[in-house]
């Protein structure tokens, strides 16, 4: 309430420590080391260009069967969100998901920033110094809001290696693509490609631009 960044940083630090203590207290003993490795790897996983989760980056040689229990524990504790890929945006989305391809985000964008060791002051003073990661923080923020609004399931869409839309949600009668832009530059070839191919009734783009509706694209 008093806009004290250092106080907010201390609170986030305490929350992260509490979560990590919970790993040791409540998780199955065999999964505790995996939980720590997995948790710490999420900021690095998101730093890659396509951000798809790779088991081998948690621990060299690790496979899905080695980490799946730990992943599910973090999900059931509501600490992370697993967003799976779809290639065909049709209802029901769950019928077209590729469960082997997914991204992991944290339940809270402030915790992601803290876990990624991005100083809070840099966001206000020098945001260009982490221009690329700023996009991941924006995605995590938007996802957080979608989850709060009880949209489920939430996926992301790709067309091979050619195009990718950040989020795809299932509305009552439609599938809605969502693009997230952290700045004023809102050029989005992937969203354009998606809209040309599937002709959704509505598409959403979150950016720093003012609110507007342009040919079915709500910014």
Predicted regions and their residues:
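Accessory nucleic acid-recognition modules appended to NTPase machines
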Residues: 2-169
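Short, flexible loop segments at the rims of nucleotide/cofactor-binding pockets, characterized by
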Residues: 58, 180-182
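Active-site beta-strand-loop-beta-strand hairpin of nuclease catalytic cores
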Residues: 169-177
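Catalytic cores of nucleic-acid endonucleases
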Residues: 182-218
């Amino acid at each position: 309430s008093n806009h004290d960044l250092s106080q907010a940083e201390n609170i986030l630090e305490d929350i992260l420590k509490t979560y990590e203590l919970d790993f040791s207290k409540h998780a199955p003993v065999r999964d505790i080391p995996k939980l720590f490795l997995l948790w710490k790897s999420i900021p690095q996983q998101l730093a890659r260009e396509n951000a798809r989760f790779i088991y081998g980056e948690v621990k060299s040689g690790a496979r899905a069967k080695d980490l799946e229990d730990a992943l599910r524990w973090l999900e059931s504790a509501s600490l992370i969100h697993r967003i799976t890929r779809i290639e065909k945006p049709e209802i029901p989305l769950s019928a077209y998901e590729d469960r082997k391809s997914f991204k992991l985000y944290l339940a809270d964008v402030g915790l992601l920033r803290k876990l990624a060791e991005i100083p809070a002051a840099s966001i206000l003073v020098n945001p260009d110094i982490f221009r690329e990661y700023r996009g991941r923080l924006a995605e995590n923020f938007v996802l957080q809001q979608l989850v709060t609004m009880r949209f489920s399931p939430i996926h992301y869409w790709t067309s091979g290696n050619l195009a990718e839309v950040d989020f795809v949600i299932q509305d009552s009668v439609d599938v809605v693509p969502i693009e997230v832009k952290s700045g004023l530059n809102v050029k989005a070839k992937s969203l354009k490609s998606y809209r040309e191919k599937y002709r959704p009734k509505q598409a959403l783009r979150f950016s720093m631009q003012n609110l507007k509706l342009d040919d079915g694209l709500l910014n």
